[in-house]
Amino acid sequence: MLALIIAVIVSLEADFVQTKSVAMMNEPQVSTGHMTYRAPDYMQWAYRSPQQMVWEVDGNNSNVNPQVQRLLRMIMAAIAGEGEVDAKAQKESRKLFQSVNVVMDESGRVAQRVELVEKNGDTTLIEFTNVVTE
């Protein structure tokens, strides 16, 4: 996620499939949704299935808990291409995750997949499709 977009962009929209594997569960949890980013500080992460839920950060306003808000802000910093914020976001990600692996598309501008490995070994794989940037 920390290298979601290399070039500075004004907006980004994408569909996603998120697969969460938790050691205590036999089957992974699969969710689908849509994400929207608008510069400089708006992010919406909307789950469509299996349960509808929307996480949103708009400037200083947010409808999510502080940990989710930090995660969304890390994504926004990566999308915005803000060097100083990227360094801060990377430091913050080390507190939350054991590793963050990003697979870029052929252009090298947009992430196709992001794999997050939490400190406890649980993993989250996010695959992006239908990406539109401005």
Each model region followed by its residue ranges:
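An acidic-aromatic
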Residues: H34-I79, D122-L125, N130
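A generic structural signal for short, solvent-exposed coil/turn residues
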Residues: I6-V8, E27-Q29, Y37, Y47, ...
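N-terminal secretory signal peptides
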Residues: S11-A46, Q51-G59, N101, E115-L116
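Flexible, processing/modification-adjacent segments and terminal tails
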Residues: A7-V22, N26-P28, Q51, N60-K91
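Gly/Pro-enriched, hydrophobic low-complexity segments
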Residues: G83-E134
